[in-house]
Design a protein with these regions (language model features):
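Core mid-bundle transmembrane helix pairs that form the ion/substrate translocation pathway
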Residues: 10-11, 18-19, 157-163, 167-273
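Entry/N-cap segments of selected transmembrane alpha helices
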Residues: 5-20, 78-109, 116, 182-204, ...
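Hydrophobic transmembrane alpha-helices of secondary-active transporters
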Residues: 36-43, 59-85, 170, 174, ...
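Alpha-helical transmembrane segments and their lipid-water interface positions
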Residues: 35-38, 47, 66-70, 100-108, ...
Length: 304
């Protein structure tokens, strides 16, 4: 039955992802590597153990996993820390994001001669850093200190820059590919949705604080926090925008008005299976054919 297929598929993704970490641990590789490799191996291009309808039906995991990661990074944006490291973090973020984007655009457009629209979008994507893999690797190694705090702040701000850059780039690329005149309102609308997400996240941070009195039991704290994060993800899905910025601002507001780091620790205990499924699913979606076959990539240039 369909129910049996769903349950067995999720069980396989979880257990095989765990087994692969036993191998990567011997090689001193992060668990994220194990999860992605597992997804590739059990995916449609190798063993084909997971039906395509399961892969398509778990698309929501991406938003939920990113929401957990973004909320947890908010813990590192205490106002006292921002005052101390703010200028340094901003300079590092802008330099690495802008230089990466410029380099990718030069290579894609002037060297590989890909079309302008695709080159612009790829350049904007180069500005972003994957927060999930960074946070999971830090958790796995137990790393702490000023460097880790600065790294997480840079990764978080980097995604702010990346999302804004992508919002602009995708609008410019659509205009370029369609040959129509530039519509400034499309750019403003995309940026506006991200700003709205930030504002809503701040509001949800205050709501979360109001719903978390000190007498609230541990179980109910977890239930309430999950319901708020899931609700916010749903609103972002309706607005067709990423929950990343909003959940980041939610976590930032919550930690600064409550100084309650216990909630973040609770969510850290709950999130590993979701993050494992997210990365395994990323591997399942990986198109091995596009690495060497130019006809499956954009233009005629293979990804490899």
């Amino acid at each position: 039955s369909d129910i049996a297929i769903i349950i067995i598929s999720i069980a396989l993704m979880l257990f095989l992802g765990f087994l692969m970490t036993r191998i990567t641990k011997k090689l001193r590789l992060p668990n994220v590597t194990a999860y992605i490799v597992t997804g590739i191996l059990i995916g449609p291009y190798v063993l084909n153990l997971i039906p395509q309808k399961i892969i398509d039906g778990t698309a929501f995991l991406s938003d939920i996993a990113l929401a957990f990661i973004a909320f947890s990074t908010g813990e590192f944006f205490r106002f006292s820390t921002i005052k101390k490291n703010g200028p340094k973090v901003v300079i590092i973020t802008l330099l690495e994001a802008l230089l990466a984007s410029i380099l990718v655009f030069v290579v894609m457009y002037f060297i590989l001669h890909l079309n302008l629209a695709f080159s612009i979008v790829l350049a904007s994507l180069a500005a972003a850093t994957a927060p999930a893999s960074t946070v999971m690797t830090i958790r796995q190694t137990g790393a702490k200190g000023d460097f880790v705090d600065t790294l997480l702040q840079v990764v978080a701000l980097d995604d702010v820059v990346g999302l804004i850059a992508y919002s602009i780039a995708i609008s410019v690329a659509m205009v370029s590919s369609s040959g129509t005149s530039s519509n400034f309102m499309d750019v403003v609308k995309n940026i506006g949705f991200n700003v709205l997400s930030l504002a809503l996240g701040c509001g949800f941070g205050f709501v979360l604080k109001w719903l978390m009195p000190k007498k609230r039991s541990t179980d109910n704290r977890l239930i309430v926090s999950l319901s708020i994060i899931f609700l916010f993800c749903g609103i972002c899905a309706v607005l067709d925008t990423s929950p990343l910025l909003g959940c980041m601002s939610m976590g930032t507001i919550y930690i600064n008005i409550t100084n309650d780091d216990k909630l973040f620790k609770q969510l850290n205990y709950f999130s590993p299976p979701i993050l494992l499924l997210f990365f395994v699913r990323s591997g399942l979606n990986f198109d091995l054919g596009s690495l060497t076959n130019g006809s499956e990539a954009v233009g005629t240039t293979p990804l490899l």
